[in-house]
Amino acid sequence: MAKKKKQKTIKLDAEIKGILFITIGVLSLISIMSSSNSGIIGKMSKKILVFIFGLGAFIFPFFIIFVGVCLILKKGKVTYSGKFYGIVLFILNTLFCLHIGDIVTKGLDRSFFQGIVDIYNSETFLHGGVISYIVDLPLYKLFGKWGTFVIFISIYVICFILISQISLYSIISKFKLKKEKRRKEKNIEIKEDVQDEVKFTEIKDSEEIPEEKIINRIKIIDFIKNTNIEENDDTKENKPIQKGKDSNNIQGEKDINKELEEEMSKAALKTIDYEFPSIDLLNDNKSIKLKKEDKKELLNNANKLEETLTSFGVEAKVTQVTKGPSVTRFELQPSVGVKVSKIVHLADDIALNLAAQDVRIEAPIPGKSAVGIEVPNRELTPVYLKEVLDSNEFKNCNKNLAFAIGKDIAGNCVVSDLSKMPHLLIAGATGSGKSVCINTLIISLIYKYSPEDVKLLMVDPKVVELNIYNDIPHLLIPVVTEPKKAAGALYWAVNEMTRRYKLFAETNVRNIESYNELLKKGKGVEKLPLIVIVIDELADLMMVCPNDIEDYIGRLAQMARAAGMHLVIATQRPSVDVITGVIKANIPSRISFAVSSQIDSRTILDMGGAEKLLGKGDMLFYPSGESKPMRVQGAFISEEEVEKVVGFIKEKQCGEVEYEDSIIDEINTSIEINNEDRDELLEEAIKIVVDVDQASTSLLQRKLRIGYNRAARIMDQMEERGIISQKDGSKPRQVLISKDDIV
């Protein structure tokens, strides 16, 4: 109670003081404005105020009223800022300047007291009062006229700093930046087909960014590049699938198509009758470049990022902002002594301050002394397959199995060579972009290679994904949709691999490239095409016949590269029971789309990160030989575009497609054998008889610990498969295969 009573008393005292100050101020104002009606006290107060302050007497009443109002509003707790003291000093300095003229005019002949008397008897207001006289006279005697003016000017500069709260350093820096900008604007020549760059100084008028941050220079790169570029003669001399850079000139496109047709006709003389599809069958990208508002937003986010890190004690500067199709990467330059791990641990705090869905940190960026912070864009910009196929990266790629992947964050087209991988594993959740990626790979091969150079063996347990490619000349056999037939197709692939190695041994060559070179030298050998085996859903195959599929894939992955056979395996369930150790160890190149958990990401990439991807083609591309995966926005191709390309190929081919009947017969034979009552111990029994090089029912009974009837059935099954010889009286059966023949 006592405390409340004391607080109430303090409040009342402050209000009383405030009212007294306001009253004195109003009376002073009346006395100065109208001395005839202000009484004796009014006339005296006017004389005293004019004597003390001179012209400042008109300001003094307002100052007293202001103090009174502050006492009432602030409850007696009045504190004055630097701006207040700056205003008071400005008024006093103005009075000093006003009065120095009187001292200069009358000189130093009169005495000090005579000067005070002259001020008191003065009938004009145009002087600074006795206060100004007491200050100006010593200054004038010590420093003279010009020295006194220099002091007054310095005081005005101090007043400006106190009132505006702006440092002289920032003003000078701002002037330098403006001068530098004008100089650069005179020297910069505007060009097309360059990455869009802007300096931080371009938005100096923005209220959202502090002026102190303007000193930092941030480079902004937009991944969308201008495509209105004239073609030169070098870009026109390419393969049939290649066209020059995009142009709005229709006549130019017609000329390109004519050249493409001429080159395709030349290629047809050397190969089978195959007409390459036109690039015009694919859709154009109509995305627009960055707007000025988008650039300002990126720079504001860069500023927020620096402030967030500073608040956690991490000193770092943003040196470059790169806007990609799906994410924007902020490149940070940490100060000396800052641990990279400290920045990585702040991922959630950075996402919170930038209002981002999620943040992925790449520390450090390969090849740069910087840390990359990848923030998702508000709107995802698609990358169309036509852009990548029409790029110099794809057109100038002379690899055996070049295919388009997409664009990286900087907007560079990513093209890879399947023959160097040599096998590819693709994983991602439903809807993340796996099927589109497979279509992109297949269409890329169709655009760049003829059926004589590349053959495709497709396995599609989902039935609906790859059936559209039936009846194109690149296929060895129709798309395989039954899981058991898929095992038979892989079994044929293993046999084909073995056959090719035998051919290599006979001709003393080591790989398919050397073997096909013999044909160019005039030696009578058959040309062996490269074979790409595409499996769209591995998980479904592993559920039906896991042992066979794993064994076949493992054998192909280990040995098929030199034979010109390459695997592309996709699955939406990257778990350890689908991507087994054997498969994972032999397929070093991986593409991971968005997955549901970090465990799945580690299964496919051996590291986290895929769980933070955005879907819709956002991927981590991890080719063999690289230390870290690369973030890429996958090229998009619609079903309509696939239908156009496939329809064009079917329309232009002569006659019906001739499939390899021998492959189909071999697959059907293996299916018939597998459809019988196959014992689950058959494989183990085969290994036993091959190891001991003899086969008998009693041997299987002892080794497998089974009864006579089951052992006899296993013996019959091995006989049907040609593993052991037929029964010949009392003679022991012969084992017809060796350890090398076991698949």
Curated annotation (Swiss-Prot):
<dbReference type="InterPro" id="IPR018541">
    <property type="entry name" value="Ftsk_gamma"/>
</dbReference>
<dbReference type="InterPro" id="IPR003593">
    <property type="entry name" value="AAA+_ATPase"/>
</dbReference>
<keyword id="KW-0547">Nucleotide-binding</keyword>
<feature type="binding site">
    <location>
        <begin position="431"/>
        <end position="436"/>
    </location>
    <ligand>
        <name>ATP</name>
    </ligand>
</feature>
<comment type="similarity">
    <text>Belongs to the FtsK/SpoIIIE/SftA family.</text>
</comment>
<comment type="subunit">
    <text>Homohexamer. Forms a ring that surrounds DNA.</text>
</comment>
<dbReference type="InterPro" id="IPR036390">
    <property type="entry name" value="WH_DNA-bd_sf"/>
</dbReference>
<feature type="transmembrane region" description="Helical">
    <location>
        <begin position="14"/>
        <end position="34"/>
    </location>
</feature>
<dbReference type="Pfam" id="PF01580">
    <property type="entry name" value="FtsK_SpoIIIE"/>
</dbReference>
<keyword id="KW-0472">Membrane</keyword>
<keyword id="KW-0812">Transmembrane</keyword>
<dbReference type="GO" id="GO:0005524">
    <property type="term" value="F:ATP binding"/>
</dbReference>
<keyword id="KW-0132">Cell division</keyword>
<dbReference type="InterPro" id="IPR050206">
    <property type="entry name" value="FtsK/SpoIIIE/SftA"/>
</dbReference>
<dbReference type="GO" id="GO:0007059">
    <property type="term" value="P:chromosome segregation"/>
</dbReference>
<protein>
    <recommendedName>
        <fullName>DNA translocase FtsK</fullName>
    </recommendedName>
</protein>
<keyword id="KW-1133">Transmembrane helix</keyword>
<dbReference type="GO" id="GO:0051301">
    <property type="term" value="P:cell division"/>
</dbReference>
<feature type="domain" description="FtsK">
    <location>
        <begin position="411"/>
        <end position="602"/>
    </location>
</feature>
<keyword id="KW-0238">DNA-binding</keyword>
<feature type="transmembrane region" description="Helical">
    <location>
        <begin position="146"/>
        <end position="166"/>
    </location>
</feature>
<keyword id="KW-0159">Chromosome partition</keyword>
<dbReference type="InterPro" id="IPR002543">
    <property type="entry name" value="FtsK_dom"/>
</dbReference>
<keyword id="KW-0067">ATP-binding</keyword>
<dbReference type="InterPro" id="IPR027417">
    <property type="entry name" value="P-loop_NTPase"/>
</dbReference>
<dbReference type="InterPro" id="IPR041027">
    <property type="entry name" value="FtsK_alpha"/>
</dbReference>
<dbReference type="GO" id="GO:0003677">
    <property type="term" value="F:DNA binding"/>
</dbReference>
<comment type="function">
    <text>Essential cell division protein that coordinates cell division and chromosome segregation. The N-terminus is involved in assembly of the cell-division machinery. The C-terminus functions as a DNA motor that moves dsDNA in an ATP-dependent manner towards the dif recombination site, which is located within the replication terminus region. Required for activation of the Xer recombinase, allowing activation of chromosome unlinking by recombination.</text>
</comment>
<dbReference type="Pfam" id="PF09397">
    <property type="entry name" value="FtsK_gamma"/>
</dbReference>
<feature type="topological domain" description="Cytoplasmic">
    <location>
        <begin position="167"/>
        <end position="743"/>
    </location>
</feature>
<feature type="transmembrane region" description="Helical">
    <location>
        <begin position="48"/>
        <end position="68"/>
    </location>
</feature>
<dbReference type="GO" id="GO:0016887">
    <property type="term" value="F:ATP hydrolysis activity"/>
</dbReference>
<keyword id="KW-1003">Cell membrane</keyword>
<dbReference type="GO" id="GO:0005886">
    <property type="term" value="C:plasma membrane"/>
</dbReference>
<feature type="transmembrane region" description="Helical">
    <location>
        <begin position="124"/>
        <end position="144"/>
    </location>
</feature>
<dbReference type="Pfam" id="PF17854">
    <property type="entry name" value="FtsK_alpha"/>
</dbReference>
<keyword id="KW-0131">Cell cycle</keyword>
<dbReference type="InterPro" id="IPR036388">
    <property type="entry name" value="WH-like_DNA-bd_sf"/>
</dbReference>
<feature type="transmembrane region" description="Helical">
    <location>
        <begin position="84"/>
        <end position="104"/>
    </location>
</feature>
